[in-house]
């Protein structure tokens, strides 16, 4: 009623913004306690703009102003890398999403570093900025398994469960060595190792609630320095030798920036998040144009 002439799309995004503002308030005490490092609420930019760096930058700036503890998600496509630098320069704390490979995490971190250095050169404050780069570890596993299925590869199934962990540990090693100010974030859990086998670094490990319950019920005692340990050769060698897709994900130069958008794992995930936009519009439509047959 407060938006009588708004489109379904406009109403949907108004809902996203209002819900995000309300949720962000819950995290404000932790945000203040951690001086911006933690206590943030992630809000997603419109994934339909995945090829438009300016649109992503503009929306990231808009969303960052909704609350002081917003962190804004931008997908790691080829076209979006420029947005990571520019939005950072404009003071936005970013969460890089739709990200699966060491190469993507490096491109993000380098772009954010450029943005931070531009701010520093102009005397602009960065003390409360807390950028993160997600690795969708479970979707790494998923994509390697798709490749294994297509190839008819015969390997110990346990090995495939380590693909996301291996990529995360390698990226963490690179981040530590290069001193990036962006932190890694683990997302898209598929097994407890996406928590228990990547602990001990300056990273964000935040299992969804359902996984927190499972982990507690399992009573697992994690290795508190697991992220800094090398992957066993019996696991890593077969992954590198048998699965070209895994090597693209694992190697520092496995993907070129111009390959990010059309990489298989990216396309799979983009299709999912784009469908979510359609689902949001459908949800609004059921309210604004209710089905009279029900």
Residue ranges with predicted function:
Residues 19, 23, 55-59, 83, ...:
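General structural feature for long, well-ordered alpha-helical segments within catalytic domains
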Residues 225-294:
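C-terminal extensions of enzymes
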Residues 8-19, 23, 51-55, 100, ...:
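Catalytic cores of large soluble enzymes that bind and process phosphate-bearing ligands
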Residues 1-84, 89:
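Active-site beta->alpha loop and helix N-cap motifs at the rims of alpha/beta catalytic domains
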